[in-house]
Amino acid sequence: MTNEMKTKMIARIHEEIADHNEYEMMSKEYDNPCRQVLHDIACDERTHAHHLYDILKRHNVELPVDLENKIKSM
């Protein structure tokens, strides 16, 4: 895996986490069924972040500690 790809994937994980957090906050502002739809979207974003994280881990990429902590707290 190239350094450029590692950098892009790490940046994308940060974006997926931010998206997850945004959709979760939005879901708390609505009643059903909108709440559930927004929560489901947040779950998808979390899944994307975890998949990218897993790919990097399989390639033995060392990740910043803050990113490790964010992933583990999701």
Predicted segment positions?
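Non-heme di-metal
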Residues: M1-M74
